[in-house]
Amino acid sequence: MKLSDISAKLGCALEGDGQVDIVGIAGIEEAEAGHLTFLSNPKYKAKLRHTKASAAIVPADFEASAAWPLPLLRHANPYLTFAHAIELFYSPPPAPHGVHPTAVVAPTAVCGHNVRIGASSVIGEGVVLADGVTVYPNCTIYPGVRIGRNSTIHSNCVVREHVVIGEDCIVQNGAVIGADGFGYAKQADGTWYKIVQSGSVVLENRVEIGACTTVDRATIGETRIKSGSKLDNLVMIGHGSSVGENTLLCGQVGLAGSSTVGRNVMLAGQVGVAGHLHIGDNVVATVKSCIWKSVEANQVLYGNIPASDSHTWLKASAVFRQLPHMQKSVQQMQKRIAVLEEPFKTNGKSGQADAPPKVALECHGTTGDAPQG
């Protein structure tokens, strides 16, 4: 495809030879001749100068010298433009055609137009698959599930009873939507009694669920993932939780039960959220942050412990074990300082001139009286 054609399709300003042939998309360091690459972070500008790519997508205000070595496509949002460029060259694998002969579809299930169901998938009683739904092979859709238009369920997924999935959703391989929440009551003999998880899960429109992610059903009521939210692989959503619109949860994030996450929140990898907490809109939590209390909107949280060399870590660990004793020592020093400061406070209140406190000097290893002032 000619670079000029790509420029027109992406709405970019072309700078340089538009007749260059582009055969694919690649990163700055991996690109070869014929590839289109991109730059969204200015700190990689030096690498762009030495790339083997035939052209690059860059920010609209990118400063290039007159002798810049390759043609440029300028755009205000180069990363989003890069995402659109991939679509010009990527051909997804073909979806199942119609209903595979080995699929099991209950007689009470309702399938809309252009529904595709792959081999060995099971569609339960009363399931409703709207127009354009695709269910890849080896999926199990329990009774009473409703899946909205143009949503895709990839292979080896399980969607449990009465779950509702909206339009244009994507559920990646191995995800489980609507498994029982983790709810037990302790009995008199010390054993655990399983609490029936009678609620459900609702995925609103344009939600994406990553591979092997689990979203548990509520004990009562619902667990809800709101429109436009994206959950990475291996994310765990506890029962009764709610995730707001356009929120990103990265790999291995865990929400304990009844957590409420606001809109446009970003939780980085391995962030943990304790149960029954509220996280406000636009909060960002960095990698491995432990959120143990509710967070107001528009906060940035740093709660991780960075890795360090073993020598430094062992020294820090030794100090950590001494903290209780150190705290006691600090408290004792604070009390002594308060005693020393008391005469100053008293003199100040009475209007008398401050005088230094009399402090007894205890001399060790000597005989005789202390020096007299």
Swiss-Prot record:
PANTHER family: UDP-3-O-ACYLGLUCOSAMINE N-ACYLTRANSFERASE, UDP-3-O-ACYLGLUCOSAMINE N-ACYLTRANSFERASE 1, MITOCHONDRIAL-RELATED. It comes from the Bacteria. PROSITE patterns: HEXAPEP_TRANSFERASES. The keyword Lipid metabolism applies. This is UDP-3-O-acylglucosamine N-acyltransferase 2. The active site is at 239 (proton acceptor). HAMAP family: LpxD (MF_00523). GO terms for biological process: lipid A biosynthetic process. Pathway: Bacterial outer membrane biogenesis; LPS lipid A biosynthesis. Residues 345-373 are annotated as: Disordered. The lineage of its organism: Bacteria, Bacillati, Cyanobacteriota, Cyanophyceae, Gloeobacterales. GO terms for molecular function: N-acyltransferase activity; structural constituent of carboxysome shell. One of its GO terms (cellular component) is membrane.
